[in-house]
Design a protein with these regions (language model features):
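Preference for the N-terminal adenyl/adenosyl cofactor-binding alpha/beta module
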Residues: 2-195, 222-232, 239, 270-284, ...
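Signature of N6-adenine DNA methyltransferases within the class I
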Residues: 10-18, 25-32, 37-40, 117, ...
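Short acidic (Asp/Glu) and glycine-rich catalytic loops that position anionic groups and cofactors
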Residues: 72-77, 99-103, 217-218, 266, ...
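Short mixed-charge
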Residues: 136-167, 198-216, 245-263
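Positively charged N-terminal leader segments that act as targeting/secretion signals
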Residues: 286-289
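Glycine-biased, low-complexity coil/linker segments
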Residues: 291-293
Length: 429
């Protein structure tokens, strides 16, 4: 899929990929070999036939394993290659991926599709609005300094330039974490929002009289993710890569080279809630029930660490108490409750653990804001304890308590909650 896109935006020369898959003289084995050769060159850069292929890197082609292709699969490849993939809506990747999963595991894997409008209700108050407020406060400062400047390079111009570079440094170092990223819908919109804000500031700074910077400082490095399913995590990386390339194409920026793709190791494939330290320890000391198949030398469950981020956004998986045991197992469920004892009450929905972890990071000063989607059951019962803890240590400043939404083909009611360090007036419907 990435190669379809890369070819249609000019990163691969001369309809090379389409020509390869459309060569009807190739047997399945020869086509597989041709794809393997192309992917190897894309990984390292260099000649493929007479064409010079850019160094793509990024990790997408790190492990090259091409499955055998049936006649029907080769036909489907040819049909797909005939389409124009340059304007593919990367937000549909989640839906495509979800349909390939066992429906009973969709909630557990967290790979359900969230429409852009819903994501926007989280991204706007948590990411976009606070950054735009910082920029809007900086603009009159730049205006005042440049009004005193008589020529480029004088002390007032340099002072304005330093202020603007400070703003760009803030954007460059900004980190957006989705700790249940699925196939990357929230990360894609977060990246687009950051780049839109930076682009706007470059245009306005140039209008004020500052020299235009050559390139942007925001990019895939700003996006952090955690996802349990390996395939979903890889799709999230592809979503971010294509989102970056599409944005640059749309706004007239050249593609980066050497490499074309930034490594996205910071979109991690692992559990966002629990980590397991190696044993050995006596089975009697394990924070798991006896008889769960974990004896001498079993790993010790501890709270999983999240990478340092500026904000957290996301749509954690929806699992109630009984479904947690059915889908995650008794041992995992008991371990989770013991590790978070005193913070998340037993019997609370799975999604509340993400809320509590975000709250704790805000309280410890490592995180500014968070915006998460939950089922509307978070408003009451044992789930409510987590919201009360958020209100005590920080504040909920924007929320939608009962919104319609579709998950795994079923209509559900959700709550969207933005909380953290914000001075904005509360918007609570």
């Amino acid at each position: 899929l990435f190669c379809f896109f890369a070819e249609d935006v000019g990163l691969l020369p001369g309809r090379m990929f389409e020509g390869l898959v459309n060569n009807r003289k190739l047997t399945s084995d020869k086509l597989t070999g041709g794809l393997r050769n192309l992917f190897t060159v894309m990984r390292d850069g260099g000649l493929y036939g007479n064409d010079d292929i850019p160094w793509f890197n990024g990790g997408l082609f790190q492990k090259i394993s091409i499955p055998s292709l049936s006649v029907m699969e080769m036909t489907e490849l040819r049909n797909a290659a005939s389409l124009n993939w340059s304007a593919i809506d990367v937000s549909i990747f989640g839906t495509l991926f979800e349909r390939g999963l066992d429906p009973s595991k969709r909630s557990q894997l967290g790979a359900h599709y969230t429409d852009p409008a819903t994501i926007g209700r989280i991204v706007e108050p948590v990411l976009a609005r606070p950054l735009l407020q910082i920029w809007e406060l900086l603009v009159p400062v730049l205006q005042a300094l440049l009004a005193k400047s008589t020529k480029k390079g004088d002390k007032h111009y340099k002072a304005a330039q330093v202020k603007f570079i400070g703003w760009l440094d803030l954007l460059r170092d900004y980190r957006v974490l989705d700790p249940a990223c699925g196939s990357g819908n929230f990360l894609f919109l977060g990246l687009k929002t950051l780049k839109d804000i930076e682009h706007k500031s470059h245009i306005e700074a140039a209008t004020l009289g500052l020299e235009r910077e050559a390139d942007l400082v925001t990019g895939p490095h700003n996006m952090l993710g955690i996802e349990l399913n390996e395939y979903a995590a890889e799709l999230a990386r592809v979503t971010v890569w294509i989102g970056e390339l599409q944005w640059r194409l749309l706004h007239g920026y050249e593609f980066k080279t050497n490499p074309v793709l930034e490594p996205l190791d910071h979109i991690e494939c692992r559990d966002a809630l629990l980590a397991f330290l190696p044993g050995p320890i006596p089975a009697s000391k394990l924070p798991l029930p006896q008889g769960e198949g974990r004896g001498e030398g079993s790993p010790i469950p501890v709270e999983a660490a999240w990478p340092k981020a500026s904000v957290v956004i996301g749509n954690p998986p929806f699992l109630g108490d009984k479904k947690m045991r059915a889908e995650l197992g008794d041992a995992y469920t008991e371990a989770l409750r013991k590790v978070f004892a005193g913070r998340v009450p037993g019997g609370a929905d799975l999604v509340t653990y993400w809320f509590e972890k975000a709250r704790a990071q805000i309280e410890n000063g490592g995180l500014r804001k968070a915006g998460l989607v939950s089922t509307n059951s978070i408003r009451g019962g044992k789930n409510r304890v987590v919201l009360d803890a958020i209100s005590k240590s920080t504040r909920i400043y924007e929320a939608w308590s009962d919104e319609g939404w579709v998950n795994a083909g079923a209509a559900v009611r959700v709550s969207l909650v933005a909380f953290g360090n914000s001075m904005q007036s509360a918007v609570l419907n």
